[in-house]
Amino acid sequence: MKRTFQPSVLKRNRSHGFRARMATKNGRQVLARRRAKGRARLTVSK
């Protein structure tokens, strides 16, 4: 049986990267929450 997690940096960044978050209103809310919480990393992208 094939494992469900098949890592790809490109897919990861397109779904969860900084620019993907900034592209939508809700994504920007995610970043705002994470900034307010004091997260060291806002998104998975470098």
UniProtKB/Swiss-Prot annotation:
Pfam families with a match to the protein in the record: Ribosomal_L34 (PF00468)
Classification via InterPro entries: Ribosomal_bL34, Ribosomal_bL34_CS
Keywords: Ribonucleoprotein, Ribosomal protein
Assembly and binders: Part of the 50S ribosomal subunit.
Family: Belongs to the bacterial ribosomal protein bL34 family.
Gene3D superfamilies: 1.10.287.3980
GO MF, one annotated term: structural constituent of ribosome
GO BP of this protein: cytoplasmic translation
GO CC annotations on file: cytoplasm; cytosolic large ribosomal subunit
Name of the protein described by the UniProt record: Large ribosomal subunit protein bL34
Highest taxon, organism lineage: Bacteria
